[in-house]
């Protein structure tokens, strides 16, 4: 029996948190397929947002498991992982989007063409990855939250980053569907999902990509 590949789930430690629904779907789909490791900046615990009746019990049960304690993103060696997954994280634009540690890991994944998957507001985390003042995902096609989706938030005027604008301004190719529609883009080894609703489709593509390697 072959050993399972290892997947790193990177989550935000910012106060805006991590989508409970997206993280639950990521974890439940990946757990049978991968050995999982979670990581956050500073190894801080994950602050779940949008917890409701369907996710509340799962979050409670998850929080007492050993793997609920994230590793420090700063100490992660990207070479140890075969896949990288960033769920929908409203907090990503506050910390992951500027993380030198995540940039280092993403540079390794690009150099080795290893699968990377980012969903919804987690796509903002990809903005951290620059080399020689150039974004390493320029010339990639991708999606992420559209302005039409983001503008519905009361925090829109205070957002430090608009993913759609960043991608277009830094040489990427951006597409989106209508608000809240399932929309996933696969370009080479990069998978992006537009929103929380796209989580399952994006992660299933990550699993397929890993199975084909």
UniProtKB/Swiss-Prot annotation:
Domain of life: Eukaryota
Predominant location: secreted
Positions in coiled-coil regions: none
InterPro entries per record: Class_I_gatase-like, Prot/Nucl_acid_deglycase
Subcellular location: Secreted; Early endosome
UniProt keyword annotation of Secreted present: yes
Gene Ontology CC, one term: extracellular region
Keywords: Endosome, Secreted, Signal
GO biological process: methylglyoxal catabolic process to D-lactate via S-lactoyl-glutathione
Presence of keyword Electron transport: no
GO function terms (MF aspect): glyoxalase III activity
Secretion signal span: 1-20
Description of how the protein assembles with itself and partners: Homotetramer. Component of the FERRY complex.
Family to which this protein belongs: Belongs to the peptidase C56 family.
Function, in words: Component of the FERRY complex (Five-subunit Endosomal Rab5 and RNA/ribosome intermediary). The FERRY complex directly interacts with mRNAs and RAB5A, and functions as a RAB5A effector involved in the localization and the distribution of specific mRNAs most likely by mediating their endosomal transport. The complex recruits mRNAs and ribosomes to early endosomes through direct mRNA-interaction.
Protein name per its UniProtKB record: Glutamine amidotransferase-like class 1 domain-containing protein 1
Organism of this sequence: Danio rerio
Lineage, broadest ranks: Eukaryota, Metazoa, Chordata, Craniata, Vertebrata
Gene name, Swiss-Prot/TrEMBL: gatd1
């Amino acid at each position: 029996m072959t050993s399972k590949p290892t997947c790193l789930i990177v989550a935000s430690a910012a106060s805006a948190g991590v989508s409970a629904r997206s993280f639950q779907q990521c974890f439940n789909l990946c757990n049978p397929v991968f050995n999982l490791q979670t990581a956050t900046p500073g190894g801080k615990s994950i602050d779940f947002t949008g917890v409701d009746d369907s996710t509340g019990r799962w979050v409670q049960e998850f929080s007492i498991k050993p793997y609920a304690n994230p590793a420090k993103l700063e100490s992660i060696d990207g070479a140890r992982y075969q896949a990288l997954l960033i769920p929908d994280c409203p907090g990503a634009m506050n910390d992951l989007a500027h993380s030198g540690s995540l940039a280092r890991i993403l540079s390794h994944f690009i150099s080795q063409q290893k699968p990377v998957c980012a969903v919804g507001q987690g796509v903002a985390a990809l903005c951290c990855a620059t080399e020689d003042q150039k974004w390493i995902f320029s010339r990639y096609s991708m999606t992420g939250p559209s302005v039409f989706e983001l503008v519905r938030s009361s925090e829109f005027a205070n957002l430090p980053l608009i993913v759609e604008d960043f991608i277009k301004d830094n040489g990427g190719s951006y597409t989106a569907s209508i608000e809240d529609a399932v929309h996933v883009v696969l370009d080479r080894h990069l998978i992006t999902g537009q929103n929380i609703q796209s989580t399952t489709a994006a992660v299933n593509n990550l699993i397929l990509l890993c199975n084909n390697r």
